[in-house]
Regions:
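Helix-to-loop junction immediately C-terminal to a conserved catalytic motif
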Residues: 61
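Conserved ABC transporter NBD signature motif
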Residues: 69-81, 85-86
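Conserved ABC ATPase "signature" region
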Residues: 110, 114, 121-139
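Conserved ABC ATPase signature
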Residues: 143-147
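Catalytic Walker B motif of ABC-type/P-loop ATPase nucleotide-binding domains
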Residues: 168-172
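ABC ATPase "signature
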Residues: 227-228
């Protein structure tokens, strides 16, 4: 039986917003979310803009401290919650990652290998593996500032893989990409699932999530409103696709708003 690889319990993130007349209001961007992802599983986080997806993923990646709650990683028979130790097992892709434009993709990966304290030979071997998996060969020695959007995104993903993490957390990995670039990243995620990696990612593309994900978690206003397999969610709501599922759940919860 597959074990839970990443576990989050009751995550809350509260931000303070300044209102008129110097009044301050606390807003929960994430409001009591618990979840887990098993080894060899892809879980999609779906929700409209402002639902709390990016905040949630940043907390799961240990890049943002939660106001409440805990995130841990299970590696073998050990459960780890220390921030630094957890980060060593996570590859995080932001939806606005900025790369060093004057470096080539190869130079970037070599630099990261040094930062992670990897022996040079191990780094070079890992770069060759990553290059094949993500089809970087044709541009890996070109300066990043000269790459296309799709090539830059593949270089960004490569940056997350140098230290061979067990968990991938990707925020909108195919956003704004052409069909071929999106397909390459989707196939990459499928192949990594077969290798036993745990993948948690957010997307606005419902059809992509339906094709790719083993489970879906739908969130709105920082809360989980439903979760399950694509098939079970469609059966529950009697809808033909995830777009219809989400619309139905919003109506059921009575949380229709400007979205």
């Amino acid at each position: 039986m597959k074990e839970n690889r990443i576990i989050a319990h009751n995550l809350v993130k509260t931000f303070t917003k300044n209102e008129k007349k110097n009044k301050k209001v606390d807003i929960n961007a994430v409001d009591g979310i618990s979840l887990s992802v098993k080894e060899g599983e892809i879980v999609g986080i779906l929700g409209p803009n402002g639902a709390g997806k990016t905040t949630l993923l940043r907390m799961l990646s240990k890049l943002m401290k939660p106001t409440e709650g805990m995130v841990s990683i299970r590696i073998g028979d050990k459960e780890i919650s220390d921030d630094i130790e957890v980060k060593r097992h996570i590859g995080y892709l932001s939806n606005n990652t900025k790369l060093y434009g004057r470096l080539s993709a190869r130079e970037l990966l070599q630099m990261l290998g040094t930062i992670y304290g990897m022996p040079k030979e191990d780094t070079e071997q890992k770069i060759e593996e990553i290059s094949k998996v993500l089809s970087l060969e044709s541009f890996i020695d070109n300066r990043i500032e000269k790459l296309s959007t799709g090539q830059t995104q593949r270089a960004s993903i490569a940056r997350c893989l140098v230290h061979d993490p067990q968990v991938y957390i990707f925020d909108e990995p195919t956003l704004g990409l052409d069909i071929l670039s999106s397909a390459a990243i989707i196939e990459f995620m499928k192949s990594e699932r077969e290798r036993g990696k745990s993948i948690l990612y957010s997307t606005h593309y419902m059809e992509e999530a339906e094709y790719l994900c083993d489970r879906i978690i739908m969130i709105h206003h920082g809360k989980i409103i439903s979760e399950g397999t694509p098939g079970s969610l469609k059966e529950e709501t009697e809808k033909e696709n995830l777009r219809g599922v989400f619309s139905e759940l919003i109506v059921r919860e009575g949380i229709l708003d400007e979205h």
